Swiss-Prot record:
Record domain CHCH: where: 31-72
High-level lineage: Eukaryota, Metazoa, Chordata, Craniata, Vertebrata
Species of the source: Mus musculus (Mouse)
PROSITE patterns: CHCH
Gene Ontology cellular component annotations, sorted alphabetically: mitochondrial intermembrane space; mitochondrion
Sequence motif Cx9C motif 1, residues: 34-44
Motif segment (Cx9C motif 2): 54-64
Identification of the protein by name: Cytochrome c oxidase assembly factor 4 homolog, mitochondrial
Record flagged with keyword Disulfide bond: yes
Keywords annotated in UniProt: Disulfide bond, Mitochondrion
Free-text function comment from the UniProt entry: Putative COX assembly factor.
Length: 87
């Protein structure tokens, strides 16, 4: 009696057209101007595997994002005021 080796499946994973696109979170961080501090957090976490040892990097990233959010709020407020002044 001969035993045949089962063939593997021939399924193929559908290729997404957006595979080449950058992750939306990475895009957001890059646009914020905080990519360098985010990278520092990632690098520290990869090295230490313990977020507690990365608190200076985490705090720097938090400060950068907070400043960016404050700038964004101010910009939105200015646009809102300009729009209401035109009406």
């Amino acid at each position: 009696m001969s035993t045949s080796v089962p063939q593997g499946h021939n399924w193929t994973r559908p290729v997404k057209k957006d595979d080449d696109e950058e992750d939306p979170l990475d895009q957001l961080i890059t646009r914020s101007g905080c990519a360098a501090s985010h990278f520092a957090v990632q690098e520290c976490m990869a090295q230490h595997q313990d977020w507690r040892q990365c608190q200076p990097q985490v705090q720097a990233f938090r400060d950068c994002m907070s400043a960016q959010q404050a700038r964004r709020r101010e910009e939105l407020q200015r646009r809102k005021e300009q729009a209401s002044a035109q009406h």
